[in-house]
């Protein structure tokens, strides 16, 4: 197993503390030059907390951040999103090496471009890219929402890719669920046998 964590709540708290307003486009946080450093600091700190918590439970965990063992190479998602990256390559050799040594990789959803510039990556997008690259059997997305809701706001317990795409097109799926569901679709269309949102 491996764990890719987000940092949305911690990032929001830090930005609020500094009176910096967040903007979102299609569920993705617009990240400017000032914000990327804050995002990185919050992610690294949260990563350390997860490692400590796991070690207290006698679990061997290895930190994966852009400072230590960067595994995600990115390109800019779009100019309007700023320092938001789209994964283009995952270093699976490093991940497999860590896993074979019986460590659980704890991964921050950030990556570096060819010039070494750091980029924020939506955690679900990063998880999907890693799952596809490793040809994982399952991708579990843990979230604070119930899951996919239909137009009557009833929970959809199972959905096919084409049905999910229709729900995005007609805006039944919106906001932060868009990148989550797009990740699910890309994962199952690229070799991951199943995706579960819990």
Can you annotate each of these PLM segments?
Residues 1-197:
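Nucleotide/pyrophosphate-binding catalytic subdomain
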């Amino acid at each position: 197993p491996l764990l890719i964590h987000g940092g949305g709540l911690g990032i929001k708290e830090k930005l609020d503390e500094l009176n910096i307003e967040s903007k979102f486009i299609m569920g993705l946080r617009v990240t400017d030059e000032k914000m990327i450093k804050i995002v990185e600091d919050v992610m690294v700190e949260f990563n350390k907390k997860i490692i400590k918590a796991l070690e207290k439970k006698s679990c061997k965990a290895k930190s994966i951040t852009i400072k230590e063992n960067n595994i995600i190479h990115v390109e800019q998602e779009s100019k309007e999103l700023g320092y938001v990256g789209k994964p283009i390559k995952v270093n699976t050799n490093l991940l497999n090496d860590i896993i074979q040594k019986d460590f659980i990789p704890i991964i921050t959803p950030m990556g570096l471009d060819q010039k070494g510039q750091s980029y924020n990556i939506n955690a679900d997008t990063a998880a999907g890219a890693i799952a596809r690259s490793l040809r994982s059997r399952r991708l579990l997305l843990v979230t604070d929402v119930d899951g996919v809701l239909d137009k009557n706001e009833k929970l959809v317990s199972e959905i096919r890719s084409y049905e999910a795409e229709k729900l995005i097109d007609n805006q039944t799926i919106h906001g932060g669920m868009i990148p989550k569901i797009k990740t699910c679709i890309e994962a199952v269309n690229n070799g991951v046998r199943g995706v579960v949102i819990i």
